[in-house]
Amino acid sequence: MIEADRIISGQAKVDEDVIDRAIRPKLLADYVGQPQVREQMDIFIKAAKLRQDALDHLLIFGPPGLGKTTLANIVANEMGVNIRTTSGPVLEKAGDLAAMLTNLEPHDVLFIDEIHRLSPAIEEVLYPAMEDYQLDIMIGEGPAARSIKLDLPPFTLVGATTRAGSLTSPLRDRFGIVQRLEFYSVEDLTSIVARSAGCLNLELEQQAAFEVARRSRGTPRIANRLLRRVRDYADVRNGGVISVDVAKQALSMLDVDDAGFDYLDRKLLSAVIERFDGGPVGLDNLAAAIGEERDTIEDVLEPYLIQQGFLQRTPRGRIATSKTYRHFGLQKLSD
């Protein structure tokens, strides 16, 4: 199964961008969850505005779907500046980045998603731009080539990544602010679902919002996606009213259980229990057993399972916890 095909995937789907923009909070006051990040960014932004400076360069990292792009846009809105958006894989040539940098206005935000995928050549262009607001450009070719420096306006680079450990040290060290986004609580997700329902003019019971939230794997993007599918079900089966029973029926139809697991999650945990006696099992063996790439397990499946206490990562391998056995209604054998 391709990760992007899963309804509980934290990765963005192509057709979601327009709807996501419609329900995305614009200001910190509307931003739900991440209290420490919200408080810190409020201080940093206000201080930069008081000094009439550009905000320090900001690195945002965390699992997919937690709001990195949303936070980048909020920074630009709070600073009252423009935001230009690109991604690491798109920036193939130094000239591509140079064109974006030279078109920035003072204090503008340049947002680079998947910044860990920048090529070394692009990073070399970024270093002086981030540190000195200067751009080194080579003019000509061969022996006649020469380097000229262009001054850039003070700007804020906001980088987003799901793999902060993959950033090179020179790039990571140039970010003055580093924020990690954590999985959201069910309470915060319930508020997010209720807010999104309001933006979409949906008739949603509070308990129905809770049902969607608790199956959303701590991830706002998943919560909003499930809400849209529950809306479809309610439109067809209940005149558009999303009651708690309708929400439960819709989510059951979508094969999302009470813990927010889909077939792939259950397949992974079942493999650890049934094929490897609960573990420990090495990542390569586990990947082979369920027919998935090890990167998919490590980057997509494991973070939530570990964070929720269903899977334990040890030096010897992955181990199913007692919570996993209880979820499947099984008795854990004594060691």
From Swiss-Prot:
GO terms (molecular function) for this protein are: ATP binding; ATP hydrolysis activity; four-way junction DNA binding; four-way junction helicase activity
Residues bound to ATP? I23, R24, G65, K68, T69, T70, E131, D132, Y133, R174, Y184, R221
What is this protein called in UniProt?
A: Holliday junction branch migration complex subunit RuvB
What segment(s) does the record annotate as region Head domain (RuvB-H)?
Answer: 258-335
Region labeled Small ATPAse domain (RuvB-S) — which residues? 185-255
Q: What does this protein do?
A: The RuvA-RuvB-RuvC complex processes Holliday junction (HJ) DNA during genetic recombination and DNA repair, while the RuvA-RuvB complex plays an important role in the rescue of blocked DNA replication forks via replication fork reversal (RFR). RuvA specifically binds to HJ cruciform DNA, conferring on it an open structure. The RuvB hexamer acts as an ATP-dependent pump, pulling dsDNA into and through the RuvAB complex. RuvB forms 2 homohexamers on either side of HJ DNA bound by 1 or 2 RuvA tetramers; 4 subunits per hexamer contact DNA at a time.
Top-down, what is the taxonomic lineage of the species of origin?
A: Bacteria, Pseudomonadati, Pseudomonadota, Gammaproteobacteria, Pasteurellales
Task: List the GO cellular component terms.
Answer: cytoplasm; Holliday junction resolvase complex
Q: Give the matching HAMAP family.
A: DNA_HJ_migration_RuvB
Any idea of its EC number? 3.6.4.-
Q: Native species of this protein?
A: Haemophilus influenzae (strain PittEE)
Q: Could you tell me where this protein is found in the cell? A: Cytoplasm
BP-aspect Gene Ontology terms? DNA recombination; DNA repair
Going by the UniProt record, its keywords in alphabetical order are:
ATP-binding, Cytoplasm, DNA damage, DNA recombination, DNA repair, DNA-binding, Hydrolase, Nucleotide-binding
Q: What is said about its interaction partners and assembly?
A: Homohexamer. Forms an RuvA(8)-RuvB(12)-Holliday junction (HJ) complex. HJ DNA is sandwiched between 2 RuvA tetramers; dsDNA enters through RuvA and exits via RuvB. An RuvB hexamer assembles on each DNA strand where it exits the tetramer. Each RuvB hexamer is contacted by two RuvA subunits (via domain III) on 2 adjacent RuvB subunits; this complex drives branch migration. In the full resolvosome a probable DNA-RuvA(4)-RuvB(12)-RuvC(2) complex forms which resolves the HJ.
Please state which protein family the record places this protein in: Belongs to the RuvB family.
Where mainly found?
Answer: cytoplasm
Say if the entry is tagged with keyword Thylakoid. Answer: no
Ranges for region Large ATPase domain (RuvB-L): 4-184
Which residues are recorded as binding Mg(2+)?
T69
Protein's UniProt keywords contain DNA repair? yes
EC top class named in words: hydrolase
Any matching Pfam family: RuvB_C
Entry comment, domain topic: Has 3 domains, the large (RuvB-L) and small ATPase (RuvB-S) domains and the C-terminal head (RuvB-H) domain. The head domain binds DNA, while the ATPase domains jointly bind ATP, ADP or are empty depending on the state of the subunit in the translocation cycle. During a single DNA translocation step the structure of each domain remains the same, but their relative positions change.
Matches recorded under SUPFAM superfamilies? P-loop containing nucleoside triphosphate hydrolases, Winged helix' DNA-binding domain
NCBIfam families listed in its UniProt record: PRK00080.1 (NF000868), ruvB (TIGR00635)
Q: Which reaction does it catalyse?
A: ATP + H2O = ADP + phosphate + H(+)
